């Protein structure tokens, strides 16, 4: 195995985006309903694509069901442990640190596993269909990806719903303060 610029540049870009993802997901995040709605759409399309792919390998539906159950379990736990904070007129939110750690660990472990597997088996990728067959033999990656997709769809939907109520309550309190003066 030798390192070339062809493999170093993508690795640097991937590491940069992983760093941004980790930094953004730990701690308070600004409440941006438009971004949350975009996240719902993207993860819904991703989950739909995984569901379609599972039609080729029907045994993967079991892993998708486990991903759904795990994702909803994390959403349920995150709903119970969400906290909001107001700074300089903006609303920030965060969920429990263990939910964030579980998601990051699952994502990073499966991501690194798949990248390592692809790097080690790169000569086999010249054959048509070998990548699809390698995914079919590793259903845990699909289950984990579906778990993450279900979590982000459910949690983002919950935050959007909660933020509407929070913003309405905030506007009501503002009007009440103005009338009290």
From Swiss-Prot:
Localisation: Cell membrane
Keyword set, alphabetical order: Cell membrane, Membrane, Sporulation, Transmembrane, Transmembrane helix
TM region positions: 5-22, 35-57, 61-78, 91-113, 140-162
Induction: Transcription is activated at hour 4 of sporulation, requires sigma-K and is repressed by GerE. Maximal expression depends on SpoIIID.
Example of a GO cellular component annotation carried by this entry: plasma membrane
Biological processes annotated in GO: sporulation resulting in formation of a cellular spore
UniProt topology in membrane: Multi-pass membrane protein
Name the UniProt record assigns to this protein: Protein csk22
The organism of origin for this protein: Bacillus subtilis (strain 168)
This protein's encoding gene: csk22
């Amino acid at each position: 195995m030798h390192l070339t610029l062809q493999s170093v540049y993508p690795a640097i870009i991937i590491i940069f985006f992983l760093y941004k993802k980790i930094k953004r997901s730990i701690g308070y995040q600004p409440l941006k309903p438009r971004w949350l709605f975009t996240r719902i759409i993207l993860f819904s399309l991703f989950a739909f694509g995984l569901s379609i792919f599972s039609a080729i390998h029907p045994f993967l539906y079991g892993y998708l069901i486990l991903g759904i159950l795990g994702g909803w379990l994390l959403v349920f736990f995150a709903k119970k442990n969400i906290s909001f904070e107001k700074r300089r007129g903006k609303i920030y939110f965060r969920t429990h640190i263990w939910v964030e750690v579980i998601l990051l660990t699952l994502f990073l472990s499966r991501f690194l596993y798949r990248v390592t597997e692809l790097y080690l088996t790169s000569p086999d990728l010249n054959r048509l269909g070998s990548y699809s067959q390698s995914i079919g033999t590793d259903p845990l990656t699909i289950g984990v990806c579906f778990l993450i997709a279900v979590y982000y769809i459910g949690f983002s939907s919950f935050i959007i719903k909660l933020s509407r109520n929070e913003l309405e309550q905030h506007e009501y309190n503002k009007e009440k303060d103005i009338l009290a003066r």
